[in-house]
A protein has these predicted regions:
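Amphipathic alpha-helix face/heptad-repeat signature
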Residues: 24, 50-51, 116, 144
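Long, charged low-complexity segments
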Residues: 68-182
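Charged alpha-helical initiation segments
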Residues: 1-44
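Long amphipathic alpha-helical segments with strong coiled-coil/leucine-zipper propensity
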Residues: 40, 50, 71-72
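Solenoid-repeat scaffolds in large eukaryotic assemblies
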Residues: 47-48, 54
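Short, charge-rich amphipathic alpha-helical segments embedded
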Residues: 55-73
Length: 182
């Protein structure tokens, strides 16, 4: 696993969309692997943080690989502001735009992304706030672990249906193997 992928400059998504999307997918896989490793070591909040970063990278990859379809749909709907937003920052799947992105991707045929994004935002809250009963969606460590495992599995399933290159396939197999140890 090339650890420098997550640390390197990404190409402009408008110039090299396929490369950008592939790098974000690889980043998603690397973060997912780290989430599993953190969970195995008992660091649930760190695992949650990595899982959320993985989800954002995966969503960015999906947006860029489906960018033309999203923009075409927005043009038909007359949503010029949405088009500008996707060109300016939406392609990167910012946290504040994840729900809208999930809806747009579901409109293209991706199933369950709104529900998963809602759950991932809960994981994000847990990563920052821990078991604070006034803020966190989880009130026990056990509940957080159950949710983390379910969401990791869901993300694995989503990645599994994508066409992957050899490096991505190898990393996904490694992820599945480590997940089975949880």
């Amino acid at each position: 696993m090339d650890k420098l992928i997550m640390e390197s400059q990404l190409p402009k998504f408008t110039r090299e969309p396929e490369k950008y999307s592939r790098l974000r997918l690889l980043e998603a896989l690397q973060e997912l692997y780290l989430s599993i490793e953190m969970l195995k070591e008992g660091y649930t909040r760190n695992s949650a943080s990595k899982l959320f970063l993985s989800w954002k990278a995966l969503m960015s990859s999906l947006v860029v690989s489906n960018f033309n379809k999203i923009i075409e749909k927005k043009k038909k709907e007359g949503k010029e502001d949405d088009i500008k937003w996707y060109l300016r920052i939406g392609y990167s799947a910012p946290t504040t735009g994840l729900m809208g992105i999930a809806r747009d991707l579901e409109d293209l045929g991706f199933k369950g992304l709104v529900t998963l994004t809602t759950a991932m935002l809960g994981i994000h809250k847990y990563a920052y706030n821990g078991l604070d009963e006034d803020i966190s969606p989880f009130h026990s460590r056990k509940d957080a672990i159950i949710a983390l495992k379910e969401l990791i599995k869901s993300e694995i399933d989503i990645v599994n249906v994508n066409s992957l290159d050899e490096e991505e396939k190898e990393l996904l197999e490694k992820i599945k193997k480590e997940f089975d140890k949880l």
